[in-house]
């Protein structure tokens, strides 16, 4: 595992948009490989999807994930009176499977426990992230053929 003390978050700014697009693309390119599209078509589609996603969550806490001071990912969290909604967590490819995502989710779990709120999220049904969230204690709470709804409940005392 990477040194967790070198992991931090900062607020995303408009200047981060090129980096955020890079992170988003790194999570989507593989699934587009089977479409038979050119690289230009893939990039245009990803940019369109990225901009639509940006407009979908205007109220969320949009954070840049920093490791050793370098931007390595993004975390989108929507907090309301009933729950904490994890809208997105994504790391650049070379920073995945190093324990960084787990550390951030565990920090969010501590926040949820302190607030007495569940954490909810949606994940693509076929994504390896389903197993990641299950290992962290999330359970399936609904969904459809495309997306699973998952929930983590803080322990009650």
Predicted regions and their residues:
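A short beta-loop-alpha structural element at the N-terminal edge
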Residues: 8-22, 29-33
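Conserved GNAT-fold acetyl-CoA-binding loop/helix
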Residues: 28-54
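Conserved beta-hairpin
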Residues: 61-75
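Conserved GNAT acetyl-CoA-binding A-motif
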Residues: 112-124
